[in-house]
From Swiss-Prot:
The keyword Ribonucleoprotein does not apply. This is tRNA uridine 5-carboxymethylaminomethyl modification enzyme MnmG. It comes from Mycoplasmopsis pulmonis (strain UAB CTIP). It comes from the Bacteria. It is found in: Cytoplasm. NCBIfam families: mnmG_gidA. GO terms for molecular function: flavin adenine dinucleotide binding. NAD(+) binds at residues 271-285. Homodimer. Heterotetramer of two MnmE and two MnmG subunits.
Amino acid sequence: MIRKNFDVIVIGGGHAGVEATFALAKMNLKVALITIYKDKIGAMPCNPSIGGPAKGIITKEIDALGGVQGYYADKAMIQVKMLNESKGPSVRAIRAQIDKEKYSEIIVKDLLQNENVTIFEDFATDLIVENDQIVGVELEKNKTISSNLVVMTTGTYMNSRILRGSDIEHTGPNGEKTGIGLSKALERLGFELIRLKTGTPPRIYSDSIDFSKVEEEVLDVNGYVFSPRSNVKIDKQIHCYLTYTNEKTHKIIQDNINKSAMYSQLIEGTGPRYCPSVEDKIMKFADKERHQIFFEPETSRQDIMYINGLSTSFPVEVQKQIVKTIPGLENARVKIWGYAIEYDAINPLQLKKSLESKKIKGLFLAGQINGTSGYEEAAAQGLIAGINAGLKFKGEDEIVIQRNHGYIGVLIDDLVTKGTQEPYRMLTSRAEYRLLLRNDNVDIRLAHYGLKAHLISQQDYQKILEKYKKIDEKIEELKTKFVSSKTDFAQKYKIENGISYFQALTRPDIEPSDLIKDFEFLNEMTIQIRLEGYIKKQNNAAAKMERLENLKIPEKIDYSQILNLANEAREKFNKIRPQTIGQASRISGINPADIQMLLFYLDLKKSKHEN
């Protein structure tokens, strides 16, 4: 049966699918959201947290663009802290423990009330394509939904299987449904698939844990939020707990290593480098006497603990032995045993920077299907794919976030330029302009993209511009005001006459609020003042990069026509099809001589065209 045509179809209701759906609905488009389980939209199948190094900044960037992850995380958070607070502003990031049930419930409630969203509790089995243009999606319950725009956000559900030792189940996360239909469809359409793996630890009933044997983590009382729109303040935060592996743990793992699905070569997929299983940590870091294990509550009820650091692919009988060696878990009752999960993804080199497929017009892909790991990375891609699908529907230009404007820009550029052979996780070290990509300036960095995407109002955008105008004016004022050596402030910080307020604020030992009272943007201004020289350097470097980004490469360029271009460069340019000179220059193995040849060829073609 052919159903009513939708403006856009979103396949998958995870973190990427949620962002895409909300963005498209806010752009006033009619969206069909296909999800296997309606009550599990926005579910957190792995860790019950959002944020962390770099990731927390991504969540704030999503919010600055008009996305929803930070807003719902605030509404469901049960604990929040600022990581790396003693370090520089560029590496500080929020991490929040989330009530995973509440998070999903409030998302589902808002989607069900959204008149632009129709939810299909069904399973997508095929993509319908005509003349390299997506035209619809086939569903398991004998329906076809039609649209010229589809956003695929299938997560780890494509051709997935769960492994605990030699015990293999062909299911999705937590024993949920999987299917091979979409994998076959993508292969039929010429996509290169890759096989990836991730894992998850056991979940333990809290009433079986001896908390007297573990360390209670200190709570951060500052009350941070991801989204200023949420108006949230947590009255009472909930503790996490810290313990460690030990000699007994390590011996059991070493003695049984061949029973691990990963070490017995049952797993074909590549696992995440920066989130290794416990057996990987013990085998690769044999010199370490212990590894951290965190007990993290999954909900505000605190009845189930997520055992962070104990991800594993061992069979249940070995997991039982391992769990009993962990202090506090000697008598633990387990709700869910740990497992590894393998799934299909695509090589992301097959995508444009808009996250539209290069092969099939109107088909966008986002999230773990593109080779990433993490809720934050998935949500960021879902938002950009949703925005660009919506802009395509409206006949407007796509948005591409530059590397100096956001971690989201770094993430997508890395994927579509370098590709990945393992689950990609965002790290601060991946961003060459990380001093520009801070928590405190996400609004001014990204609001203009949100405005262009119709997710930020003109009124809200003007407020942001006004904020930074006030900061600039205040900075100029501080340069003309001087500290008197007779004040208590001067005595406290041993300041003599002749120093301006601006110069005083450059000193890291000075508490800004001791000098300036009642300025609402004091934190943002202080960071700007103290990093001024470094920011200027990075802005200059970014400006050079942006000039290369503005040099577009024709979509149908024939690289075989470029004389003196190295064979490796020709092969890589043909495979990746870079959209700009800047992107071409970042491809692995490409050197300055290759770029010079490419520029010379483009100039020659331009001259011939003009003549």
